[in-house]
């Protein structure tokens, strides 16, 4: 064998070795590439799964927040309703109590009107009844009881009850000429309308 043949053979062997090595590296690269692609697919699937779980969790959080807001609103409404019911019950109980006291006020006023203030023996008694009446009226006024004494006012059927109607040249038509019995209201609600005589 000549040098040239040996040289060609050597080159051929080197080229075969390079090709074989390239094939081996290519195969390893294919294996690494396939493994990397599989790992990427697994990670993408895991990411998709985690994103889906996150969306479900976010929906649950929104539902819980809505639920909490509704519960708070319901509690606030219940608190407000119970306060109103307690207030109504208190006012109703107070109105029944006040209605029972109205005849006492009427009787004290009748006693004051009937007493003759000119008689010396009755003056101390009259002063005591007047003081009792004033104290009594002031005390119940603290709880919202107001007197309805519409003398000279225009007749209002919400607050007045017409007992009679008379012609009068001195008064405008539909005016209260005389109050037979005072009316009372408690916290804006009429307990007893004033009994009045109205001009025609």
Curated annotation (Swiss-Prot):
Keywords: Chaperone, Cytoplasm, Stress response. One of its GO terms (cellular component) is cytosol. GO terms for biological process: protein folding. It holds the Pfam family GrpE. CDD domains: GrpE. The keyword Chaperone applies. Residues 1-30 are annotated as: Disordered. It is found in: Cytoplasm. Residues 1-12 have a biased composition (Basic and acidic residues). GO terms for molecular function: adenyl-nucleotide exchange factor activity; protein homodimerization activity; protein-folding chaperone binding; unfolded protein binding. Belongs to the GrpE family. Homodimer. Participates actively in the response to hyperosmotic and heat shock by preventing the aggregation of stress-denatured proteins, in association with DnaK and GrpE. It is the nucleotide exchange factor for DnaK and may function as a thermosensor. Unfolded proteins bind initially to DnaJ; upon interaction with the DnaJ-bound protein, DnaK hydrolyzes its bound ATP, resulting in the formation of a stable complex. GrpE releases ADP from DnaK; ATP binding to DnaK triggers the release of the substrate protein, thus completing the reaction cycle. This is Protein GrpE.
């Amino acid at each position: 064998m000549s040098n040239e043949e040996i040289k060609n053979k050597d080159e051929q062997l080197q080229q075969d070795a390079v090709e074989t090595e390239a094939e081996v590296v290519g195969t390893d690269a294919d294996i690494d590439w396939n493994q990397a692609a599989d790992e990427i697919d697994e990670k993408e699937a895991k990411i998709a799964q985690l994103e889906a779980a996150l969306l479900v969790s976010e929906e649950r959080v929104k539902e819980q927040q809505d639920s909490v807001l509704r519960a708070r609103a319901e509690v606030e409404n219940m608190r407000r309703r119970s306060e109103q019911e307690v207030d109504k019950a208190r006012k109703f109980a107070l109105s029944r109590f006040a209605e029972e006291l109205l005849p006492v006020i009427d009787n004290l006023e009748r006693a004051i009107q009937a007493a003759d203030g000119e008689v010396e023996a009755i003056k101390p008694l009259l002063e005591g009844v007047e003081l009792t009446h004033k104290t009594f009226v002031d005390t119940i006024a603290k709880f919202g009881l107001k007197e309805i004494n519409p003398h000279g006012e225009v007749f209002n059927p919400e607050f007045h009850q017409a007992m009679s109607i008379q012609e009068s040249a001195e008064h405008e038509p539909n005016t209260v000429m005389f109050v037979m019995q005072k009316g009372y209201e408690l916290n804006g609600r009429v307990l007893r309308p004033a009994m009045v005589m109205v001009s025609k």
